[in-house]
């Protein structure tokens, strides 16, 4: 079974309020087995536009990633983000097929 991922690009506009979102999202992330692979590290936008933060979160499955996004726990966290940040988020299924080489 393929893992699931959230890919998020975020511009934080109110850092203090955004801290509330970070605290609130921990409940949903723990429940659905989320694991941060990238969390606002150094980056270089080599093509296209970028936001100030990039986040990649891994879930045990694509369904778990969707379930987390649609959960009451994450909706409560997402509500905390309103007015604190602008985000682009996609939920994507991982790839388990053959690799080059």
Where are these regions (language model features)?
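C-terminal structural segments of small proteins and small subunits
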Residues: 66, 74-90
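Short S/T/G/P-rich N-terminal loop/turn motif that feeds into the first structured element of a domain
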Residues: 1-53, 60-70, 93-101
